[in-house]
Amino acid sequence: MKITQEEVTHVANLSKLRFSEKETAAFATTLSKIVDMVELLGEVDTTGVAPTTTMADRKTVLRPDVAEEGTDRDRLFKNVPEQDNYYIKVPAILDDGGDA
């Protein structure tokens, strides 16, 4: 499956990323190769092969859900450069949120 430069540009725009034309072409080529490799997996005959759900040889180990005392909020916010009513203020990275 060929990934076009237009598709790469579209996804980059949704992600608020900017790439040069050369980078976009390289991404399109690389992504096309990756998709082709993944599509090859569909050709493998897995008849009679049991599904693999995990590579771990043990079952999920869950800890008891016990409430513990948390860290003091004032102590946590001691090193925060800017805050407002216990919210950490950070610089905006998106102009208006776009259409994503």
From Swiss-Prot:
Q: Does the keyword Kinase apply?
A: no
The protein in question is named Aspartyl/glutamyl-tRNA(Asn/Gln) amidotransferase subunit C
Q: Name one GO biological process term.
A: regulation of translational fidelity
Q: Which Gene3D superfamilies does this chain map to? A: Glu-tRNAGln amidotransferase C subunit, N-terminal domain
Family matches, as Pfam families: GatC
Q: Which UniProt keywords apply?
A: ATP-binding, Ligase, Nucleotide-binding, Protein biosynthesis
Task: Give the Enzyme Commission number.
Answer: 6.3.5.-
Q: What's an example of a GO molecular-function annotation for this chain?
A: asparaginyl-tRNA synthase (glutamine-hydrolyzing) activity
Q: Which InterPro entries match?
A: Asp/Glu-ADT_sf_sub_c, GatC
**What is annotated about its quaternary structure and interactions?**
Heterotrimer of A, B and C subunits.
State the superkingdom: Bacteria
Reaction(s) catalysed by this chain, per the record, are: L-glutamyl-tRNA(Gln) + L-glutamine + ATP + H2O = L-glutaminyl-tRNA(Gln) + L-glutamate + ADP + phosphate + H(+); L-aspartyl-tRNA(Asn) + L-glutamine + ATP + H2O = L-asparaginyl-tRNA(Asn) + L-glutamate + ADP + phosphate + 2 H(+)
Q: List the disulfide bonds.
A: none
Describe the task this protein carries out: Allows the formation of correctly charged Asn-tRNA(Asn) or Gln-tRNA(Gln) through the transamidation of misacylated Asp-tRNA(Asn) or Glu-tRNA(Gln) in organisms which lack either or both of asparaginyl-tRNA or glutaminyl-tRNA synthetases. The reaction takes place in the presence of glutamine and ATP through an activated phospho-Asp-tRNA(Asn) or phospho-Glu-tRNA(Gln).
- What family is this protein classified in? Belongs to the GatC family.
